[in-house]
Each structure stands twice: as structure tokens, then as C-alpha cells.
Design a protein with these regions (language model features):
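Conserved beta-strand/loop scaffold segments within soluble protein domains that form the structured core
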Residues: 3-10, 104-363, 377-379, 383-403
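Extracellular glycan-modifying ectodomains
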Residues: 368
Length: 403
């Protein structure tokens, strides 16, 4: 048994340090062997509509590459532009001998039972690489799709942006309209090489009884840029994630922004950590959380290890239900003289004067609250295709209705 397998075996029962603990045996590993689908013909109109809500357009047009995994099977995978490589991770590991060195390098296999399960019972996942100097104008679209009720999906993704390259990935994670429960475990390791740029947009559109456990590590080298956008607007049972970005090279930059809604019965424990290890690195972490009756823990952690670093953390939350709970947990850790780090955190309700101001201009109370909520959740995400931008705007509009 390899050392990695042994570590996974020893940690297979270890609960995560944060978030709601799960019984992994409560979920199923049985599901149909879905056929490969080069033309997306197996997807009914209802499925297509559901996938679009997670940003997945089911077309190879205007995409530099596409990847779709249904349960345990990769059903579509294609690179459509020179300079981009898109493969299932198992195939990529067989093709590139050195890729194994990137596996479990940024995320510890023995972090908890979820990382262990991803190693011991891996389904697949994606490998996406932008070749040196490639300027990839159109996004790569990746979808992780639970199509069978109660299925436990385990994926491991690796993204490499080679020196001087630029890449945008849009990942949609969702379920079949008929699926009510299940578990998604997703390990992701991103490498942004010297002078490279990666924008990663993740949109979740799960079902009400789905549990989600992403585990993400990012390494950004000298002069590199990593932009992360995370959107969760629809009901889910629980999400626990705490991605860590390491700015390892001088002048590296990251911006992490997220918007999420905790619906009744939902438990979210989400956040982001940035470790600034080199001079002139910069980081910005922005979170917008809204509780409609669910529980949300919004975390942020900035670690400045050397002088001449600058970072800001902003956590804002709105509670719109008597049953709603939001915890904002900002942390600043300065380990050297000359760091410049700040945070701003606010949790509360909509001020009465804001509602009165809008009502004085002709809106009724419900319309006024809805308008304020839409403005609170509206965060500009760069590089979205028009159809996806319209769908995201529509989802934000819907989230403000009936409050």
C-alpha cells in the first residue's frame, strides 16, 4: 500500500474540524453506468434548464473546453481550443507521469474523512491545463452532476495555469431535478505558475437534502493572479468549505468573493484563508451572506508572513428571519513587521430608514426589502457569458421576492 493510501486509511473515520459531521455510510455508491454523450443528447429539457441554473449551458460553442461528470462517470470531455488541455483526472494521471507530484500536494489526504474517502473511493474529476503563454479568451465549462438519488460523488480536480497563461473556468455543481439527497466530496488543487492568471467561478445549485464538502488548495507563484467567485443562492442541506490560497511568489495577487443564502434548515460553514508568503503580495476576501432562517458561519483568515504585504477581509451578513443565524469570524494573523492587513465585519438586519426611504418613493414594504436584498447580493463577476450572467441576475431577483 502506498504512503498516501495508508494515510487515507488511518484518517477514514476522522470528522472534519469544522462543520456538521456526516455518516458516510448513509449514502449510496450504486448508480447507473451513464453512457458517454458527445452531443448532450441524453439530457432532457428539464435537466437542461436545471443545469443552466448552475451556469452549465450544455454546448461546446463559445467554450475553450467542456467537461461533465454524472455521478461516477465522465459523460462528456473535450478541449475546443489550442493551448488548453481537458481530461478526466484518471486519464490525465496515466498520460502525464509527473502529474502525480501535484496530487495531494496542496490538500492533505488525511485532513479528514472526506479527503480520505476521495482517495480511497475516487470516481474521477477533471484535469484542466492552460499551456505556457496561452491566452484563453473563452471559458472552460466543467460540471459535476449528481444524477442518482442518495449518491455519494467523490472527485479530485487539478488545474494548472502554466507561466504567462490566462484561463477562466466556470464550474457548475448541481443535481438532477428528481434527486433529493446525496453527498458531493470535491478535492481541488490549483497551480498558477509565474505570471499566470486563473479566474475560477463556481456556482452551486443543489437539492434541499444534499451535503457538500469541497476541499481546495491554491498555489500562486510570482506575479500570478487568482480570482475566485463562489455563488450559492438555492437551498442545500449543508456546505462546509474553507479553501486556502497561498501567495508564494513576489507580487502574487488574489481576490476571493462569495455570495450565499442560508435557507430554512440549511447549515453553511464557509470561508476562505489566504497565506501571504512573499513580498508585495495582495489579497482581498469579500463575503456576502443572507439568512432566510438557516445557520451560516462565515469565516475569513489572512496570514501575513513577511513585510510588504497588503490584505483586506470583508464579511457582511443580513438576517431576514427570526430563526436565522449568522456568525462572522474574521481573523488577521501578522507574523512580521510591515504587514498591512484589515478587516470589516457586519451582521444585522435591514435598517428601517432604508425601507422607509424606498417606500417614500412609491415602493411597498415587500418591494423595498426585495430591492435592498438584490443590491446586497449583487456582486460583479467578470468574464461570464451573457446567458449565464442573465441566469445569475434572474436568480438574485428571485431570491429577493416574497421576503
Amino acid at each position: 500500500m502506498s504512503e498516501i493510501k495508508a494515510l487515507a486509511e488511518r484518517s477514514a473515520a476522522n470528522p472534519a474540524a469544522l462543520g456538521h459531521d456526516l455518516d458516510l455510510e448513509a449514502f449510496s455508491r450504486e448508480g447507473p453506468a451513464w453512457d458517454y454523450d458527445p452531443d448532450y443528447r441524453q439530457f432532457a429539457p428539464e435537466e437542461r434548464s436545471h443545469l443552466l441554473k448552475a451556469g452549465i449551458e450544455l454546448t461546446d460553442e463559445e467554450h475553450a473546453g467542456t467537461f461533465l461528470q454524472a455521478d461516477a462517470r465522465v459523460v462528456h470531455c473535450r478541449a475546443n481550443q489550442e493551448g488548453v488541455e481537458v481530461l478526466p483526472i484518471i486519464e490525465a494521471l496515466a498520460k502525464h507521469e509527473d502529474l502525480a507530484d501535484h496530487l495531494w500536494h496542496l490538500v492533505a489526504v488525511d485532513a479528514d474523512k472526506y479527503t480520505a474517502r476521495a482517495e480511497l473511493a475516487l470516481d474521477n474529476g477533471y484535469f484542466i491545463r492552460a499551456l505556457p503563454g496561452a491566452q484563453v479568451a473563452e471559458p472552460v465549462e466543467a460540471c459535476l452532476y449528481i444524477k442518482t438519488d442518495r449518491f455519494s460523488q467523490h472527485v479530485h480536480n487539478i488545474v494548472i495555469v502554466e507561466p504567462g497563461a490566462s484561463l477562466h473556468i466556470i464550474t457548475g455543481c448541481t443535481t438532477h431535478p428528481g434527486v433529493r439527497s446525496g453527498l458531493h466530496i470535491g478535492v481541488s488543487e490549483f497551480y498558477v505558475r509565474r505570471g499566470g492568471s486563473l479566474t475560477f467561478t463556481m456556482i452551486h445549485n443543489w437539492a434541499e437534502d444534499i451535503h457538500v464538502r469541497p476541499r481546495t488548495g491554491v498555489l500562486v507563484e510570482e506575479g500570478g493572479r487568482f480570482i475566485s467567485n463562489y455563488v450559492l443562492l438555492r437551498p442545500v442541506k449543508s456546505v462546509q468549505m474553507y479553501p486556502t490560497v497561498t501567495l508564494a511568489g513576489a507580487g502574487a495577487v488574489t481576490r476571493m468573493q462569495s455570495i450565499f443564502i442560508a435557507h430554512p434548515g440549511c447549515e453553511l460553514d464557509v470561508g476562505g484563508r489566504v497565506i501571504l508568503k512573499a513580498p508585495r503580495t495582495r489579497a482581498e476576501v469579500i463575503a456576502r451572506s443572507l439568512s432566510l432562517g438557516g445557520r451560516c458561519v462565515s469565516r475569513g483568515h489572512l496570514v501575513g508572513e513577511v513585510p510588504e504585504v497588503k490584505a483586506h477581509l470583508e464579511c457582511r451578513g443580513l438576517i431576514l428571519s427570526p430563526q436565522g443565524v449568522i456568525y462572522a469570524v474574521p481573523e488577521l494573523e501578522g507574523l512580521a513587521a510591515g504587514v498591512d492587513m484589515s478587516h470589516e465585519a457586519a451582521v444585522g438586519r435591514i435598517a428601517a430608514e432604508e425601507i422607509e426611504y424606498l417606500m417614500a418613493r412609491g415602493l411597498d414594504e415587500e418591494e423595498a426589502v426585495s430591492t435592498i436584498v438584490r443590491g446586497f447580493l449583487s456582486v460583479k463577476i467578470e468574464g461570464l457569458p451573457p446567458a449565464l450572467e442573465e441566469e445569475l441576475d434572474r436568480a438574485i431577483q428571485e431570491s429577493g421576492k416574497g421576503l
